[in-house]
């Protein structure tokens, strides 16, 4: 079975780069990759490390289809070379251990083919009921995160959960890796309740 869809190449490349920021090396292959799902004229790219989920949505045309990239980093490099309409041809043949999933990406005179994984193997994001919400200017939020992010360090399994995070509390945004503390104060940007997240997820 072959399904076909098309998206804007630059929009797809940008979305892929953005969600890929949350990816980590994992013993579970799909957690190191990006899920692509096209349905109802919309292409949704999803990436997760289980703790953090990133989604990007862009317009799409064609058949409904879904798959998980293999070697997302290599796919992202290829996508940066595309410009214009990007055609996605997804092939799903065979069954069981003989099942073969391939993705052909065509744009202008260029074409690349990658192996893919089944979308049903990707974890499902459980519904989240927000305890609080607030609206901020994205550029202002990014600036604050960049000011303190140097003290967040790189998240690693051997570290405490807070070491790779930026934390929000009221007018304060801060980061602490055990040896360094960075804090920024801005009364015009208030978090209604304390929370923390990976700095890389916000950059």
Predicted regions and their residues:
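Structural preference for solvent-exposed beta-strand-turn elements
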Residues: 1-203
